[in-house]
């Protein structure tokens, strides 16, 4: 059954043409090849490691993104397509209950088979079929649906490119050898010191939030709606390691008065003393584990790999708060959306380079926690069919992050993009900036 999904597309319906098909075919090859580039540094043994229930093995990621194209597009819209292996529908379905049962998330790391070679063959099989399907002539409305779904599949794959880097980093950190994902020297942009932390004032008022118009957006970014903002101030850059270090040295992790109750319980149970990946040696010197290996902690880089609880506690400690997602988006629409993204190749945040905008560093480097719970926008409706499970069913017990990170593809992010994680998670590249009331 054909459904017209509510996905904002690149052009109006009457402009869909061979140009769009060519564009999508080129983008398909580019995105799929980028995933293969990301796994090139890995050894065979790295592909099946799952160091915690939060992460997935790299092999599972490259198979799951392929399954998405096979199950959501080829099996639905190509009568001539032959499924590569029917068992893969169980192995590589992530969480789509409407499609059927699936391998439990915490057991993805037990799948020594299919082999990496098998999964690469699976990708090649599906890639050829998708490109063939795209180039076939058909009724315009059906072609539009297929093109929209291919675009969504590519956006989904870009999310998993970031997840591959997140998960590999965590897997390697649990290894006593602390191996580096990449050993090449990467020139990092940025200055030796971050600019001083100041605040920019905004009058607020009645503003519009959400996505509409041309360009892709997920269903959780719409519809556009009104939001009232009281006057507020927003920090001109994210909080740095130097500033967060002051919180640590002041005993912030031991002082319950700064923490939400659930947050302090997590801190106590898991014995947090610093952000994830920070390491202190016997001489009291700090280092940090990165995808480039262990490096000295650079104090002027944005603090990264902190949970919502840590970001919130720090904000309370210094008499500020986190911005709401509406405040963040309102400002984010007004600034340059360039930043330190995956394409730069360092896979690590760097100090804010430019201080020539009212607010800097909102895009790239680190995802920024907001004070907003992940919830549907007014009058929002999930997509039809299985894709209705993509976002809507996770709108509980999660907090919103904005802006993208150093492992996010640059053409994947926008001011309206809503990322989300449970408040205790911190293996994602998450930081924060301060806000305040006026």
Where would I find each of the regions flagged by the language model?
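Functional-site microenvironments in short loops/helix caps that host divalent-cation chemistry
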Residues: 153, 157-159, 163, 167-190, ...
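Disulfide-stabilized, aromatic/cysteine-rich ligand-recognition loop
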Residues: 5-56, 60-129, 133-136, 143, ...
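Short, glycine- and charge-enriched coil/turn segments that flank and shape catalytic ligand pockets
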Residues: 79-81, 136-145, 185-194, 357
């Amino acid at each position: 059954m054909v459904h017209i999904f509510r996905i904002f597309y690149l052009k109006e319906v009457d402009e869909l043409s061979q140009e769009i098909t060519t564009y999508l075919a080129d983008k398909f090859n580019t995105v799929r090849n980028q995933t293969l580039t990301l796994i090139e540094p890995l050894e065979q043994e790295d592909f099946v490691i799952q160091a915690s229930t939060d992460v997935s093995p790299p092999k599972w990621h490259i198979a799951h993104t392929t399954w998405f194209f096979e199950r959501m597009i080829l099996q639905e819209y190509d009568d001539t397509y032959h499924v590569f292996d029917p068992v893969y529908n169980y192995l590589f379905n992530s969480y789509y209950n409407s499609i059927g049962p699936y391998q439990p998330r915490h057991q993805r790391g037990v799948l020594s088979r299919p082999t990496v070679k098998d999964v690469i063959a699976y990708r090649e099989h599906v890639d050829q079929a998708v490109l063939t399907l795209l180039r076939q002539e058909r009724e315009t409305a059906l072609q539009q649906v297929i093109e929209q779904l291919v675009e969504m599949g590519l956006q989904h794959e870009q999310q998993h490119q970031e997840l591959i880097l997140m998960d590999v980093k965590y897997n390697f950190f649990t290894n006593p050898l602390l191996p580096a994902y990449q050993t090449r020297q990467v020139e990092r942009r940025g200055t030796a010191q971050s600019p001083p932390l100041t605040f920019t004032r905004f009058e607020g008022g009645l503003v519009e939030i959400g996505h509409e118009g041309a360009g892709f957006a997920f269903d959780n970014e719409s519809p556009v709606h009104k939001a009232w903002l009281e006057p507020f101030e927003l920090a001109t850059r994210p909080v740095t390691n130097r500033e967060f270090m002051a919180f640590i040295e002041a005993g912030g992790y031991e002082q319950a008065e700064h923490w939400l109750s659930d947050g302090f319980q997590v801190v106590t149970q898991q014995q947090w003393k610093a952000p994830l990946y920070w390491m202190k040696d016997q001489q009291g010197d700090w280092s940090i584990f990165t995808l480039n290996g262990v490096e000295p902690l650079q104090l002027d880089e944005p603090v990264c790999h902190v949970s919502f609880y840590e970001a919130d506690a720090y904000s309370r400690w210094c008499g500020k708060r986190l911005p709401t997602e509406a405040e963040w988006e309102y400002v984010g629409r007004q600034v340059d959306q360039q930043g330190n993204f995956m394409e730069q190749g360092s896979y690590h945040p760097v100090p804010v380079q430019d201080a020539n905008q009212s607010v800097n560093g909102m895009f790239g480097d680190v995802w920024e926690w907001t004070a907003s719970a992940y919830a549907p926008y007014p009058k929002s409706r999930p997509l039809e069919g299985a894709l209705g499970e993509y976002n809507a069913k996770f709108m509980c017990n999660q907090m919103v992050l904005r802006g993208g990170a150093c492992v996010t593809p640059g053409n994947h992010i926008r001011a309206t993009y809503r990322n989300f994680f449970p408040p205790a998670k911190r293996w994602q590249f998450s930081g924060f900036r301060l806000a305040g009331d006026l």
